[in-house]
């Protein structure tokens, strides 16, 4: 009986998930015993090739085997003699059950005992020679058995370490890693260094499928079924490959709601007739109301409220204060009108009367009467009887009445704030040099308004366009006019190509855009430009009729060729502005009268034109190319739209809150935009911050015609009809958290006024901190 119990315990320790059922025949038992003993191999037979051998792990709870580490850190297996008392106690419990066993079963048990002892002695002799960490292979569950046959639930597995669900790093400082079922310490397996880990990676073919059990510290070799299960989970499939995911649906219960009456008996005739008992009750209630015996619901509620008495009562105040509470709390009296001053007298002093300039300014603000200092114009009469009736009397009385009953009244506490506290602290202009301060040269030669000016990329020459139908090319250093090109109509805009490898000037005159070779500077560039513009490339794309009717490319005639004109681009409406792309191959033109074809983009190398917009969203006034990104800025009268030319979509819409936009200039880095308006304002937009202006500058007294950023220095300038050019410092920092620094530096006012026009255009020198300005006085002025 003792031998049978020992064999059962050995079988459970070696194969926890498989059971060996003994048969009646001795031959079959011997074959099964040999199969069970094949799992235990002698590692001492070949100590060099034992890396891939699977070993079994036994905790200290085993009655037959106990693992202890030797001096080298290896595990040694030894037999433990089971105590006779435990065997007797266990045998006494099973004596009654085993009495009917045959003698053949006893002989078979003895054979099993002898073979199991031999199998246990083999690993004990060779355990000291092995220096690898013990590796266990995950047991294969017999799929033919039910899932919960061996135990109640899957959570109650054969867990040898009983520490529970705790962090295992708590045992890092101890030699053991936990306790088994008998509260005995589980000694940690030997831990190799990095060299051993590296050798295992190279020599062990199953290293990739070996994982460490955190509870026991043993290396566990994953079986093929485990790897297949992991692959199915990683690939997002159902772990059980035998599960049919799309098996046919069996509708055990119908999904349609069937409505059936509980009873289908026809209604009785009396269910349609009024109740006689209710009729009698109602008649009695009516009679009681007439006789006064019964009261209505409202009368009953009134009697209840009268019995209860007042719900709230005055605790401290008397009933006389109720009238005061009904009135408006702290009424605010209407503000009185200002008393008339000396200007409203019928015979005011002469200094209160308007002169011609003040009268003109007062009449100019007819559409904005709230901006006038006085709502009337002072007049002088000899006597009081000559004063006529006041024509605005009824209107002023009416507005006063509206103010009295429509405008809310409130008491405001007047804040006494020092004016110096509100003024921002700006650096001194002396610390922000260099910037232009004086007028150095005046270029004279035009006979009418000079509308546009542009500088060569190297900064040696200057081109200007005027209303006298001429284009002049100047030498900047000497002020000498090198060449004059006459045109048929007024020159609205000129722009020098920013590509230093080409020498091309775009001239907008009337409906034509002229591409001119100025024939100045390097002769190699002049010849290269002529070769580029000599022949038209072959057209690979068929242009639509919409583009053909809007623009036409042609070579210049012989007389224009002598002047330097090489290509003529004829538009269907007058051109107002022309601008180049940074690379010099594309240029855009603006025709405010062109409706949905107001803006055109031309490609010089292919002689092809494009209409970027199919619909008009306002009168286009100005366009610009982004210096870095493929973006296109379009300014209408009130707003600015930014389009992505690659994606062909609207990126952002900037709100200027102005009446009419006159010009734009973009910072060389492309993150800030400067806008000029005809209502005396300059708007600074931070494109990364908001769609509203970061700062609004009112530095001019009249309309601002033009603004420009310097390409190298942190400077920008503006020109206005007040004959002034204001130079300002505009530093943009690389730190996105720091706002731009804007400081007005110098006001340059040397132009003369002609027909209410002042400075029409400003442009910076590409290298030096110099600025050019054109004015209505037919001059071009250089400030350095």
Swiss-Prot record:
Comp. bias (Low complexity): 124-133
Pfam families recorded: BOP1NT, WD40
GO molecular function: ribonucleoprotein complex binding
WD repeat locations: 445-486, 488-526, 570-612, 615-653, 656-695, 699-738, 754-784
Chief localisation class: nucleus
Composition-biased stretches (Basic residues): 1-11
GO cellular component, one term: preribosome, large subunit precursor
Disordered: region residues: 1-159
Record field: compositional bias (Acidic residues): 27-36, 45-54, 62-73, 84-111, 149-158
Compartments where located: Nucleus, Nucleolus; Nucleus, Nucleoplasm
Matching InterPro entries: BOP1/Erb1, BOP1_N_dom, WD40/YVTN_repeat-like_dom_sf, WD40_repeat_CS, WD40_repeat_dom_sf, WD40_rpt
Annotated PROSITE patterns: WD_REPEATS_1, WD_REPEATS_2, WD_REPEATS_REGION
This protein's UniProt keywords: Nucleus, Repeat, Ribosome biogenesis, rRNA processing, WD repeat
Biased composition (Basic and acidic residues): 112-123, 138-148
SMART domains: BOP1NT, WD40
GO terms under biological process: maturation of 5.8S rRNA from tricistronic rRNA transcript (SSU-rRNA, 5.8S rRNA, LSU-rRNA); maturation of LSU-rRNA from tricistronic rRNA transcript (SSU-rRNA, 5.8S rRNA, LSU-rRNA); regulation of hemocyte proliferation
Family: Belongs to the WD repeat BOP1/ERB1 family.
Function recorded in the entry: Required for maturation of ribosomal RNAs and formation of the large ribosomal subunit.
Record-given protein name: Ribosome biogenesis protein BOP1 homolog
Organism from which the protein derives: Drosophila yakuba (Fruit fly)
């Amino acid at each position: 009986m003792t031998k049978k119990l020992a064999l059962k315990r050995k079988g459970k320790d070696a194969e926890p998930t498989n059971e060996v059922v003994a048969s009646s025949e001795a031959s079959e038992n011997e074959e099964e015993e040999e199969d069970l003993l094949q799992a235990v191999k002698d590692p001492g037979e070949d100590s060099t090739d034992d890396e891939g051998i699977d070993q079994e792990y036994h905790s200290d709870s085993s009655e037959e085997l106990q693992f202890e580490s030797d001096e080298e850190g290896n595990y040694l297996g030894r037999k433990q003699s089971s105590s006779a008392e435990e065997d007797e106690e266990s045998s006494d419990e099973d004596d009654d059950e085993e009495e009917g066993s045959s003698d053949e079963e006893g002989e078979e048990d003895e054979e099993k005992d002898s073979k199991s002892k031999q199998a246990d002695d083999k690993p004990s002799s060779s355990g000291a020679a092995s220096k690898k960490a013990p590796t266990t292979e995950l047991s294969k569950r017999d799929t033919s058995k039910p899932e919960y046959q061996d135990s109640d639930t899957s959570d109650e597995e054969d867990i040898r370490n009983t520490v529970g669900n705790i962090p295992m790093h708590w045992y890092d400082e101890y030699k053991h890693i936990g306790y088994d079922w008998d509260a005995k310490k589980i000694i940690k397996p030997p831990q190799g260094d990095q060299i051993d880990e590296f050798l295992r990676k190279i020599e062990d073919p199953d290293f990739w499928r070996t994982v460490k059990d955190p509870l026991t510290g043993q290396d566990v070799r994953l079986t093929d079924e485990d790897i297949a299960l992991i692959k199915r989970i990683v690939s997002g499939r159902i772990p059980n490959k035998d599960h049919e995911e799309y098996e046919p649906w069996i509708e055990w219960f119908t999904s349609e709601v069937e409505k059936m009456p509980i009873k289908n008996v026809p209604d009785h005739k009396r269910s349609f007739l009024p109740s006689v008992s209710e009729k009698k009750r109602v008649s009695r209630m009516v009679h009681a109301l007439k006789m006064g015996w019964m009261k209505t619901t409202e009368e009953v509620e009134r009697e209840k409220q009268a019995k209860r008495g007042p719900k709230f009562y005055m605790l401290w105040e008397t009933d006389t204060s109720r009238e005061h509470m009904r009135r408006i709390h702290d009424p605010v009296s209407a503000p009185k009108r200002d008393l008339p001053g000396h200007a409203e007298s019928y015979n005011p002093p002469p200094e209160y009367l308007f002169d011609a300039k003040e009268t003109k300014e007062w009449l100019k603000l007819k559409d904005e009467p709230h901006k006038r200092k006085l709502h009337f114009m002072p007049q002088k009469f000899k006597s009081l009887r000559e004063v006529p009736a006041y024509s605005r009397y009824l209107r002023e009385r009416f507005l006063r009445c509206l103010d009295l009953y429509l405008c809310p009244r409130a008491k405001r506490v007047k804040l006494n704030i020092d004016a110096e506290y509100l003024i921002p602290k700006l650096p001194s202009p002396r610390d922000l040099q260099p910037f232009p301060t004086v007028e150095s040269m005046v270029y004279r030669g035009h006979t009418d308004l000079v509308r546009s000016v542009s500088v060569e990329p190297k900064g040696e020459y200057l081109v200007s366009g005027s209303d006298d139908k001429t284009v002049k090319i100047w030498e900047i250093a000497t002020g000498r006019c090198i060449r004059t090109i006459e045109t048929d109509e007024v020159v609205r805009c000129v722009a020098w190509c920013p590509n230093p490898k080409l020498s091309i000037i775009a001239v907008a005159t009337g409906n034509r855009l002229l591409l001119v070779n100025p024939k100045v500077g390097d002769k190699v560039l002049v010849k290269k430009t002529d070769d580029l513009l000599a022949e038209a490339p072959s057209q690979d794309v068929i242009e639509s009729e919409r583009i053909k009717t809007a623009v036409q490319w042609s070579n210049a005639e012989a007389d224009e060729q002598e002047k330097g004109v090489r290509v003529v681009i004829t538009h269907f409406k007058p051109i107002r502005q022309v601008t180049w792309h940074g690379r010099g191959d594309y240029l855009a033109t603006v025709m405010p009268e062109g409706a949905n074809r107001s803006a055109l983009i031309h490609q010089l190398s292919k002689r092809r034109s494009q209409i970027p917009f199919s619909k008009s969203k306002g009168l286009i006034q100005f366009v610009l190319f982004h210096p870095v990104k493929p973006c296109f800025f379009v300014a209408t009268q009130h707003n600015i739209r930014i389009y992505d030319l690659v994606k062909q979509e609207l990126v952002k819409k900037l709100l200027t809150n102005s009446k009419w936009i006159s010009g734009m200039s973009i910072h060389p880095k492309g993150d800030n935009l400067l806008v000029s308006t005809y209502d005396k304002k300059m708007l600074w937009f931070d494109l990364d911050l908001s769609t509203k202006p970061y700062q609004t500058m009112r530095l001019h007294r009249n309309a601002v015609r033009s603004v420009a950023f310097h390409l190298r220095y942190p400077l920008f300038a503006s020109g206005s009809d007040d004959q002034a050019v204001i130079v300002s410092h505009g530093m943009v920092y690389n730190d996105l958290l720091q706002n731009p620094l804007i400081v007005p530096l110098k006001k340059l006012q040397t132009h003369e006024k002609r027909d209410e026009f002042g400075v029409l255009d400003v442009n910076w020198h590409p290298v030096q901190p110099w600025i050019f300005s054109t004015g209505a006085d037919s001059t071009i002025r250089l400030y350095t």
